[in-house]
């Protein structure tokens, strides 16, 4: 007590020093009330800034006031308990309380002086931060810079700063602070009784006080200036707050540190509990000193304030109670120091006791833990301090001191909370911890070092955890507040909170928590929970301070207010707060005030955590949970926190982070949750904070939040590594910039210490529990980011991140992205889990530090997805059974149909939503959509080259265009990349080069008009292609010159050195030759390597010897010389004549067999790939071309085959082309070397390669060069026509119809021009061309929409003239009528009436006649020839029916494949004939029967036509080659050779007859419809006969084809016997007819004249005649006696009574040969026996013409083969027009009776009525001789 008195004597001068904490409280009170300033000038001076903060907060202000006034009563005891590390402090405050009040009284008495002194001193403290008027304060002021480090470390850095202080002057400062805290705190609380307070202080810290007061004395003089005292009072308080008090405590400890420590431990223990309880209960007196200290710190931006603030809840109560007296002046009258000490100790003790109950289970656990661990903690702390560097011990003392002075009032509690915060690190990261990190700074520093030890040890963590929990909660509030306070939060001081990492030191205590955080196990939680529970309780008690805090929250600057609130809550968190305090450095007062009232003020920076912390934001808590588990376990929140393992809720947190991003909600949560709860929540949210930070930066201050965290990352990069998971915290800090700056500032001094401590922490986090530990470390991190409490989730990540904090420094870019990139904001989880490893730029991750958030709570990212899943609507199922479809096609699906010409029809379903009653969501009804027609090119445009192909290549004018096109393609190949699927092939590049080379060779071939030899330019071009790098010395240099390397040339003046020769060998050789043994001499020379001698001798020997010598030379000399002599060796072999063996030099036979042979001679075998010789093919070809030898082309072919065997197709084709003997052929030709250039037809995996347009066009270019340009009139590649048709189809499919039509025309022209039809010119080709042409004509519009787009005579005749011509007889109308009528004539008798039908027949006949082969083709070939057997059974029975249908109408398919059976050859062919596409071709275009079958069927084969046609088609195909040769005038070319007989086999009899009667003109009687053999030219003779018979028919010779002549031949036999009678008869009948006609004309002359125009002449007279019923004069034929039957209205043959039958059914066979022919035709094939074919020579041509479509030529040839049935044939011919319809079944449509042998068309022909007629009548079809005599 003497000391107090002495101190009291000192009070006037030393009050600032001794009563640093008291002065701080007084200063705060002074700030609140000016009068208090005088008394608390010293104390207030130091605490002034905190006082301001407390002033802002009512509770805090009261605490300050209480500190100033009641400090003597409560402040001293509380301060003693809180600050006194040992029981000494606690006891001394009690004993000193009386003195303290007296001291306070004297202080108040000396208030003026004190104020003056404090004013003076305050100036210094204000400048120094914590320096107070007291000398001790001055010492502390000296240390203040260090202390400010602690202040900076108020957050995480606070601990480090405290450590630094302890290590440096801080240690002394802590001692002094400790002493001062003991005394100063007492004084602060008993400011009124400062003497007593100083006495107690003197007892405990006399030595320190002396030193400190001595310092103050030096400063006291200036301090005494009263005016400045008040001003300094406010400023001095901060200086005095932590600076002096800790120094006093430390000084006191210096005197009896051990005792003090124990005393403090007891007091601290009780005081700590008291503080916890008081914080919970908002009891101010004990924490007054701390409270005022925190206020001081807050005002100073000191770090430790926040920690004190949390411990100040009781102090806040004291301050509040003291504040009133202070305001009333009661501060001076406040109880004596003894009273204050008693109250203080009682308060602390009571509070501790109360706190435990208040915490409920946590309180019990906490006190139990503290009871057990109190001493242990203190011992551990002390031990830790002992073990730790002095700095650490000092830190602990400073924590004690700070706890005495500030809410951390009880050093023990602080130390314990320190440990607890460590264990409870997750809570420490909470706002309160981070913010209150400054008081915790001691704890933080201590825990950082010791606590890290402790952190590994679970005991310490529980206490710090609890504190942190509260601090976190308060900080969460603070953080929430910070959003409102964003401007201040932006301040770096909050980054000091980041020094909460110092809390990482507390994680030393955290060891238990880490397991919790990771697993959230109860044990870690217990450890941390025990202390947290009291903390939570105290925080609960300080709920009022929390209210103050909330009140303060709106006032971020006056965080001292919130600090008091938070102090109560923060008291347990104080240790943790120490680190966080640095973050709150920007609002040091706030932090300090957090200590007194609501650490949440400090939490101001932690506000972001609060934002995150809001329990509602479980995700954040979860995110924090991983780290938090340990921390949360400490407080009741711990359990809650532990349930939140960030892992699970972390995912949830990200969504809350948006919620959290708004600071207000989280502040509400912070408020709602007890400091502990919030703290626990906040740790949980810390893990989630990563996500929250993302959002928080947005709602709160994104820049502050994000930036702050990033600063922490930078400054505390070491710790950051752990924070990486809490990467989002940077955004939180960003939202609370003030804390963030603090964090960085704290980092500076204490942050470093913290980091030093943190590494252990980070080391701990390395273990899975690291997350729990990380929560502590992360709590530090969180403290650093506490301001951005919203970084809670990231903080969770911090758990592991602190260790990775250093790693996070790389995340400075994220810091840059503090603006919080939206992506990170949107998906904080991403930042939490993934960012940690990647360390992406902040911009990528948004506000949160991506890496930090990544930590254990990466799961949090999952919730990051903000978009809601799109609603899936159900379909309305049908009720008609479709719902059972497993494919659910009733739901609709796009439909595409690809049509001809590149047309695409598409239809997409429409999904129409339909609503029904009782359903909230609509259901989908699928309906058909719009049908659209588009072009395929619109969707899939074909790759078009720069130059369009000029095809079809018809004339030399195309050369230039073709060269340009080839050049463009070559350039495209050279510039194109190798396809991906070819890149794996080692030869891909080689193959591309060879392909390009092939195209270049073809270009050279085109440029040189198909000649590659004999031209210097061509040779040079080839040389340049094969050897692009070759340098020619002259134009005449050969390709072989390339291989003479200049380096090997000897100088001209160099002496020649002959090879060494063994004279004995030469002598032996000579002796051998003398004996005449040349062969022996040769081999002797070879053995001696005398190659010159051996070759000279062998040159005159057998060639085989020469070849062997050369081969041996090559093997022994050439091959072994170098590795690149394969080409030379091969060339030597070729020169030697070893053609087949030459390729062995390139690739040995063993290699081709798959063996690898090793040469024993040179040993080079295994070192070289035996297949490398293939690459020498170009050199070999060049040598051969430059040095031609007799059989070198064979060598090139062999080389090509070798290359082809190794899939070098293009190289092989180049060799084939250059060899000039390669065989081009179809796929079916086994001898063909090339089918299409660039296509290996021998290894076709599919036919797709044959549809390659490039290959087709390249082959066409080759053909063009070798035929057109070379002057050849004949196509050299007949097989290419089919591929041209394929190309035409492809053009049509791409919509290029005009070009496709051009190709069709070109193919047709080539077929016509061919004099030697090839086997490849088959009916399939004809039908395919015809079909494509017809479809193109149908679908192609020639440009106009008008009905006559292109006026042309052809179309006009087809449309108009055909109608008129249909009534006109004669061949003139056939061409036109054929085209127009063919579609109309369906049945054999369609258009039978009148001569039109007849007239048409002749025209068709002409067409076929013009085609030589057509005439030769037999009827049978017509039908099926094309479809062979199938066509026999073609649907249409009669060829006429099909013929009537246009070729397009025919059944053939549009596919490239040509439908064999779909259409009747006869029918369709006839159509082509009509179209005149294949006038000569019809025999091919249509089964010969088709075109000509019309004639034979018309005669007697009409009934048989269908069958005959089918079989005939088969036969015709058999005879296609025959046809071609028939055109060659080969009478009977084996039809079977080309077309299979099976087609004719259906009519075996016919086939037999065919074989038996091939000579009869190759036409088999209808019976042998099968095989048709081209009629022999003998038919020509008979055709001449027919001509004679029908000499009257001028057109007959024209009409006649070979077939017609054959008909004549057939009729010749009968002609001898019948002609005479027939002629007479016909003459008579003709006379009668003419007479009748004349009479009719006489009767009707006017009508005839009445007709107008020349048409009237045609139609009028004739029609009149016909209409009149009078016969028209016409030559009826020899044997025919026709008369016009008026009843039947037709001409009737008298000799054929059946002809008079009115029915058109097949009339009875005409008498004579006609009936047999008819019956034969009806039988399906004319009986082979028919010796005389009906005179179908002419008639056949006619019927074919009448058929309208060139039926197969078989019709005309048929007559010769149908010797017997000729009458029928003529008949069919006469009905030719009709006949084509039933060519296959002439019986169904019986042909008109044919006049016996006469070629003249009979009346039947003229009438066209189906009547049995004699074959000869067919010849009557001649156009000129027929008159339309049809009677109507």
Swiss-Prot record:
GO process terms (BP): autophagy; Golgi organization; intracellular transport; protein localization to endoplasmic reticulum exit site; protein transport; vesicle-mediated transport
Biased composition (Low complexity): 622-636, 814-829, 1737-1756
Comp. bias intervals (Pro residues): 510-524, 653-665, 1725-1736, 1757-1769
Stored Pfam families: Sec16 (PF12932), Sec16_N (PF12935), TPR_Sec16 (PF12931)
Annotated Basic and acidic residues bias: 91-118, 137-151, 471-480, 705-721, 1594-1603, 1620-1644
Biased composition, class Acidic residues, residue ranges: 257-269, 348-361, 369-383
PANTHER family: RGPR-RELATED, SECRETORY 16, ISOFORM I
Name the record gives this protein: COPII coat assembly protein sec16
Species, as recorded: Aspergillus fumigatus (strain ATCC MYA-4609 / CBS 101355 / FGSC A1100 / Af293)
Taxonomy of the source species: Eukaryota, Fungi, Dikarya, Ascomycota, Pezizomycotina
């Amino acid at each position: 007590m003497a000391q107090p008195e002495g101190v009291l004597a000192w009070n006037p001068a030393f009050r600032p020093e001794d009563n640093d904490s008291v002065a701080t409280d007084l200063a705060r009170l002074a700030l609140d009330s000016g009068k208090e300033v005088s008394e608390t000038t010293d104390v207030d001076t130091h605490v002034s800034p905190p006082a301001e903060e407390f002033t802002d907060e009512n509770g805090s202000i009261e605490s300050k006031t209480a500190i100033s006034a009641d400090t003597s009563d409560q402040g001293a005891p509380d301060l003693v308990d809180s600050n006194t590390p040992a029981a000494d402090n606690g006891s001394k405050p009690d004993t000193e309380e009386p003195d303290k009040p007296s001291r306070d009284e004297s202080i108040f008495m000396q208030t003026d002086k004190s104020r003056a002194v404090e004013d003076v001193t305050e100036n210094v403290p204000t400048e120094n931060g914590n320096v107070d008027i007291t000398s001790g304060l001055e010492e502390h002021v000296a240390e203040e810079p260090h202390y400010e480090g602690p202040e900076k470390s108020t957050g995480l850095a606070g601990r480090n700063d405290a450590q630094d202080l302890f290590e440096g002057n801080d240690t002394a400062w802590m001692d002094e602070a400790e002493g001062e805290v003991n005394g100063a705190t007492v004084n602060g609380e008993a400011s009124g009784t400062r003497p007593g307070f100083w006495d107690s202080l003197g007892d405990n810290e006399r030595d320190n006080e002396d030193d400190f007061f001595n310092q103050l004395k030096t400063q006291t003089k200036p301090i005494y200036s009263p005016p400045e005292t008040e001003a300094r009072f406010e400023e001095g308080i901060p200086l005095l707050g932590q600076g002096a008090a800790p120094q006093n405590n430390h000084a006191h400890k210096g005197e009896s540190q051990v005792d003090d420590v124990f005393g403090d431990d007891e007091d601290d223990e009780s005081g700590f509990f008291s503080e916890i309880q008081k914080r919970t209960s908002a009891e101010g007196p004990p924490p007054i000193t701390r409270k005022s200290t925190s206020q001081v710190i807050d005002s100073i931006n000191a770090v430790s304030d926040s920690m004190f603030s949390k411990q100040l809840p009781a102090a806040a109560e004291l301050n509040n109670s003291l504040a009133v007296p202070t305001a009333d002046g009661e501060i001076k009258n406040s109880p004596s120091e003894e009273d204050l000490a008693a109250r203080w100790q009682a308060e602390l003790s009571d509070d501790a006791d109360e706190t435990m109950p208040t915490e409920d289970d946590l309180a019990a656990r906490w006190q139990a833990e503290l009871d057990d661990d109190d001493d242990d903690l203190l011992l551990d702390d002390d031990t830790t301090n002992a073990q730790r560097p002095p700095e650490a011990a000092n830190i602990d003392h400073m924590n004690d001191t700070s706890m005495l002075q500030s809410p951390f009032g009880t050093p023990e509690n602080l130390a314990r909370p320190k440990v607890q915060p460590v264990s409870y690190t997750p809570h420490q990261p909470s706002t309160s911890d981070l913010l209150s990190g400054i008081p915790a700074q001691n704890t933080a520093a201590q825990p950082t070092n010791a606590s890290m030890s402790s952190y590994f040890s679970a005991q310490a963590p529980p206490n710090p955890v609890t504190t942190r929990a509260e601090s976190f909660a308060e900080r969460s509030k603070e953080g929430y507040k910070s959003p409102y306070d964003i401007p201040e939060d932006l301040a770096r001081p909050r980054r000091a909170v980041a020094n909460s990492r110092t809390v990482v030191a507390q994680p030393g205590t955290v060891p238990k928590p880490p397991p919790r955080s990771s697993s959230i196990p109860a044990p870690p939680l217990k450890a941390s929970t025990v202390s947290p529970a009291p903390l939570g309780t105290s925080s609960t008690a300080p709920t009022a301070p929390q209210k103050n805090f909330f009140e303060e929250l709106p006032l971020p600057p006056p965080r001292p207010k919130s600090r008091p609130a938070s102090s109560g809550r923060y008291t347990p968190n104080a240790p943790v707060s120490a680190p966080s305090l640095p973050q709150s450095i920007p609002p040091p007062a706030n932090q300090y005030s957090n200590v007194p009232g609501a650490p949440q003020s400090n939490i101001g920076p932690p506000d972001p955590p609060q934002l995150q912390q809001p329990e509602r934001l479980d995700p954040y808590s979860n995110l924090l949970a991983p780290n938090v588990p340990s921390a949360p376990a400490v407080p009741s929140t711990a359990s809650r926190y532990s349930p939140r393992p960030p892992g699970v809720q972390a995912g949830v947190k990200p969504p809350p982070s948006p919620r959290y991003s708004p600071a207000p909600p989280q502040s509400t949560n912070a408020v709602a949750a007890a400091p502990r709860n919030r703290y626990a929540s906040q740790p949980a949210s810390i893990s989630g904070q990563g996500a929250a930070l993302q959002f928080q930066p947005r709602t709160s201050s994104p820049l502050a939040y994000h930036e702050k965290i990033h600063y922490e990352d930078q400054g505390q990069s070491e710790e950051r590594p752990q924070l990486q998971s809490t990467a989002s915290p940077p955004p939180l800090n960003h939202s609370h910039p003030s804390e963030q700056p603090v964090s960085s500032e704290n980092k500076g001094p204490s942050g470093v210490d913290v980091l030093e401590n943190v590494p252990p922490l980070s080391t701990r986090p390395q273990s899975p529990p690291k997350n729990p530990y990380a929560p502590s470390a992360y709590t530090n991190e969180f403290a650093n980011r506490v301001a951005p409490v919203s970084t809670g989730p990231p903080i969770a990540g911090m758990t592991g991140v602190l260790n990775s904090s250093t790693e996070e420094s790389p995340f400075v870019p994220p810091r840059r992205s503090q603006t919080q990139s939206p992506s990170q904001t949107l998906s904080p989880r991403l930042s939490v889990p993934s960012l940690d490893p990647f360390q992406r730029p902040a911009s990528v991750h948004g506000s949160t530090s991506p890496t930090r958030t990544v930590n254990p709570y990466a799961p949090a990212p999952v919730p990051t997805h903000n978009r809601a899943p799109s609603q899936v609507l159900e379909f309305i199922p049908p009720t008609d059974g479709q719902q059972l479809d497993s494919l659910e096609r009733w739901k609709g699906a796009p439909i595409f149909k690809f049509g001809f010409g590149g047309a695409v029809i598409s239809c997409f379903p429409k999904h129409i939503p339909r609503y029904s009653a009782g359903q909230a969501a609509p259901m989908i009804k699928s309906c058909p959509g719009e049908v659209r027609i588009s072009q395929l090119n619109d969707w899939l445009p074909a790759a078009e080259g720069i130059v369009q192909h000029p095809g079809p290549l018809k004339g030399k004018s195309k050369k230039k265009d073709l060269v340009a096109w080839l050049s463009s393609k070559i350039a495209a190949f050279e510039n194109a990349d190798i396809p991906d699927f070819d890149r794996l092939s080692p030869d891909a590049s080689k193959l591309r080069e060879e392909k390009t080379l092939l195209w270049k060779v073809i270009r050279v071939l085109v440029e040189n008009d198909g000649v590659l030899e004999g031209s210097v330019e061509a040779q040079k071009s080839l040389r340049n292609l094969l050897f692009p790098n070759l340098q020619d010395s002259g134009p005449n240099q050969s390709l072989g010159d390339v291989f003479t390397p200049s380096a090997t040339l000897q100088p001209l003046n160099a002496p020649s050195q002959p090879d060494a020769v063994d004279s004995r060998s030469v002598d032996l050789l000579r002796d051998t030759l003398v004996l005449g043994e040349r062969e022996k001499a040769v081999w002797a020379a070879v053995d001696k390597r005398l190659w010159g001698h051996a070759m000279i001798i062998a040159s005159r020997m057998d060639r085989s010897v020469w070849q062997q010598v050369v081969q041996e030379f090559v093997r022994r000399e050439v091959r072994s010389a170098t590795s690149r002599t394969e080409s030379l060796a091969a060339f030597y072999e070729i020169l030697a004549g070893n053609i087949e063996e030459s390729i062995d030099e390139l690739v040995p036979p063993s290699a081709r067999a798959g063996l690898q042979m090793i040469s024993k001679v040179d040993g080079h075998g295994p070192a070289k790939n035996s297949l490398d010789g293939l690459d020498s093919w170009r050199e070999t070809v060049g040598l051969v071309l430059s040095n031609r030898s007799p059989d070198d082309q064979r060598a090139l072919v062999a080389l090509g085959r070798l290359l082809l065997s190794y899939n070098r197709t293009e190289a092989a084709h180049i060799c084939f082309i250059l060899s000039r003997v390669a065989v081009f052929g179809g796929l079916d030709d086994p001898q063909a070397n090339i089918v299409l250039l660039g296509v290996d037809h021998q290894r076709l995996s599919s036919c797709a390669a044959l549809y390659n347009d490039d290959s087709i066009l390249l082959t066409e270019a080759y053909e063009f060069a070798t035929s057109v340009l070379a002057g050849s009139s004949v196509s050299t590649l007949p097989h290419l026509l089919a591929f041209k048709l394929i190309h035409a189809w492809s053009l049509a499919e791409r919509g290029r119809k005009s070009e496709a039509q051009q190709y069709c025309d070109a193919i047709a022209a080539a077929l016509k021009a061919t004099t030697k039809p090839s086997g490849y010119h088959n009916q399939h080709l004809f039908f395919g061309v015809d079909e494509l042409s017809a479809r193109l004509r149908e679908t192609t519009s020639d440009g106009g929409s008008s009905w006559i787009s292109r006026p042309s005579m052809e179309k006009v005749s087809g449309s108009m003239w055909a109608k008129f011509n249909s009534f006109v007889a004669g061949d003139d109308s056939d061409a036109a009528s054929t085209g127009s009528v063919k579609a109309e004539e369906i049945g054999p008798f369609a258009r039978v009436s009148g001569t039109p039908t007849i007239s048409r027949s002749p025209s068709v006949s002409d067409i076929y006649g013009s085609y030589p082969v057509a005439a030769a083709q037999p009827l049978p070939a017509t039908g099926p020839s094309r479809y062979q057997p199938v066509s026999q059974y073609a649907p249409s029975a009669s060829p006429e029916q099909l013929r009537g249908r246009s070729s397009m109408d025919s059944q053939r398919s549009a596919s490239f494949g040509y439908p064999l059976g779909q259409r009747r050859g006869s029918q369709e062919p006839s159509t082509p004939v009509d179209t005149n596409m294949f006038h000569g071709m019809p025999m091919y275009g249509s089964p010969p029967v088709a075109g000509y079958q019309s004639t034979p069927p018309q005669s007697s084969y009409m009934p048989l036509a269908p069958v005959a046609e089918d079989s005939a088609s088969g036969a015709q195909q058999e005879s296609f080659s025959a046809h071609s040769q028939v055109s060659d005038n080969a009478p009977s070319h084996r039809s079977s050779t080309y077309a299979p007989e099976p087609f004719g086999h259906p009519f075996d009899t016919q086939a037999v007859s065919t074989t038996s009667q091939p000579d009869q003109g190759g036409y088999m009687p209808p019976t042998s419809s099968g095989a048709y053999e081209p009629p022999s030219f003998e038919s020509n003779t008979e055709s001449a006969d027919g001509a004679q018979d029908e000499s009257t028919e001028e057109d007959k010779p024209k009409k006649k084809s070979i077939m017609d002549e054959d008909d004549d031949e057939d009729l010749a036999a009968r002609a001898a016997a019948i002609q005479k009678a027939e002629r007479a008869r016909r003459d008579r009948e003709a006379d009668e007819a003419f007479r009748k006609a004349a009479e009719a004309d006489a009767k009707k002359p006017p009508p005839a004249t009445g007709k107008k125009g020349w048409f009237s002449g045609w139609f009028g007279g004739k029609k009149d005649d016909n209409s009149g019923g009078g016969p028209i004069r016409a030559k009826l034929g020899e044997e025919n006696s026709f008369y016009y039957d008026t009843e039947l209205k037709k001409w009737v043959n008298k000799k054929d009574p059946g002809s008079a039958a009115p029915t058109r059914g097949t009339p009875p066979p005409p008498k004579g040969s006609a009936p047999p022919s008819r019956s034969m035709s009806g039988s399906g094939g004319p009986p082979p026996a028919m010796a005389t074919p009906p005179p179908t020579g002419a008639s056949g041509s006619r019927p074919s013409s009448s058929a309208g479509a060139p039926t197969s030529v078989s019709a005309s040839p048929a007559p010769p083969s149908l010797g017997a049935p000729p009458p029928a044939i003529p008949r069919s011919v006469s009905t030719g027009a009709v006949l084509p319809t039933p060519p296959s079944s002439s019986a169904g449509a019986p042909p008109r009776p044919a006049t016996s042998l006469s070629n003249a068309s009979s009346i039947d022909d003229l009438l066209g009525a189906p009547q049995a007629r004699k074959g000869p009548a067919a010849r009557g079809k001649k156009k000129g001789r027929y008159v339309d005599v049809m009677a109507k």
